C-alpha cells in the first residue's frame, strides 16, 4: 500500500497573525511544490522548492486518525544552509464532500537561523499543501 502522502502538492505557508485587519497577502511566508516519495514503508522523502531554492526532505509518516507525517527539509540556498522541520496531517475526507481535493495541514519551524540573523531559529508558521491533479 502506497502512503497517502506520496505525490506532488502545492505548498503555501502563512504567518500566524490573528489580526484580521492584516491583508491576506501580508500573511504569506512561503510557497512552492512539495514532492513526496516513499523510499520504504513508513518513510517519506522528496523535495520542497520553487524558483531559485529547494530543500531535500526526509522523515516518516504514520497511519492514524488523521494520518500524519513529520519530516525535515535542508538545503543550501544563496550560500547559506537552511533547515526547517514540518509536521502535517492529512485532512480526512468528508463523507458527503463534493470533489474534495486531498490536503495536508500543519506547521513548520525554522530549525536553524539564516540570512545573517534576519531569519531567526524557532519561527513557526502554518501551512497547507493541496494535491496537484
Please give the residue ranges for each predicted region.
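N-terminal glycine/threonine-rich, aromatic-flanked beta-hairpin/loop signature
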Residues: 21-60
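Short, cysteine-centered beta-strand-loop-beta hairpins and adjacent loop/turn segments enriched
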Residues: 16-22, 51-53, 78-80, 113-118
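Mid-chain, well-packed structural core segment of small domains
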Residues: 61-94
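Tryptophan-anchored aromatic micro-motifs
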Residues: 1-30, 104-111, 127
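Edge beta-strand at a domain terminus
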Residues: 60-61, 103-133
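Short, solvent-exposed coil/turn segments at beta-strand boundaries
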Residues: 35-43, 62-67, 91-105
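Short beta-strand segments that buttress and anchor functional surface loops
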Residues: 11-13, 44-50, 70-78, 106-109
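Short, surface-exposed coil-to-beta transition loops
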Residues: 28-31, 53-58, 80-87, 121-124
Amino acid at each position: 500500500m502506497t502512503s497517502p502522502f506520496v505525490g506532488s502538492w502545492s505548498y503555501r505557508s502563512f504567518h500566524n497573525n490573528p489580526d484580521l485587519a492584516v491583508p491576506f497577502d501580508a500573511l504569506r511566508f512561503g510557497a512552492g511544490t512539495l514532492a513526496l516519495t516513499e523510499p520504504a514503508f513508513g518513510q517519506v522523502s522528496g523535495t520542497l522548492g520553487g524558483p531559485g531554492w529547494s530543500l531535500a526532505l526526509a522523515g516518516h509518516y504514520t497511519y492514524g486518525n488523521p494520518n500524519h507525517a513529520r519530516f525535515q527539509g535542508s538545503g543550501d540556498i544563496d550560500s547559506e544552509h537552511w533547515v526547517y522541520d514540518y509536521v502535517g496531517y492529512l485532512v480526512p475526507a468528508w463523507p458527503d464532500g463534493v470533489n474534495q481535493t486531498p490536503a495536508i495541514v500543519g506547521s513548520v519551524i525554522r530549525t536553524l537561523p539564516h540570512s545573517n540573523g534576519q531569519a531567526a531559529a524557532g519561527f513557526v508558521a502554518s501551512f497547507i499543501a493541496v494535491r496537484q491533479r
